[in-house]
Amino acid sequence: MIWWGSDPGRGLLERLAIARLEESTNWLQNVRWRLDGLKLLLDFEIVEDVSRWRLVMHYPDFFPSIPPLVFNADGERLSGHQYGLSGELCLEFRPDNWELSWTGAMMIESAHRLLVGESAE
């Protein structure tokens, strides 16, 4: 069974955590939830100064046992910490250190730190 169907409380927690992040920052914009078949996706943008990064977060079938994955929505290389040209961003939270209580909002914050940090270099 799909995680967000079998654990609607966790689905609500994810939506609320991301809504709180969006409301509390000015850099998280254009948040949009959608389904691709039965896959839950989140489109969003990180905006900092003159930079705008369009991203998509994929919630895996086995979430929250494994973390969501964050990709560039445009299929281009954004970071030296990215697997391939259109691959996922290598963030602080990975399958080897992921904890069940962590959220997609934390993944978005990690993507923000990575992209803003690299753009400042």
Predicted features by range, described:
Residues M1, G5, G87-E88, T103-G104, ...:
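Type-3 copper protein
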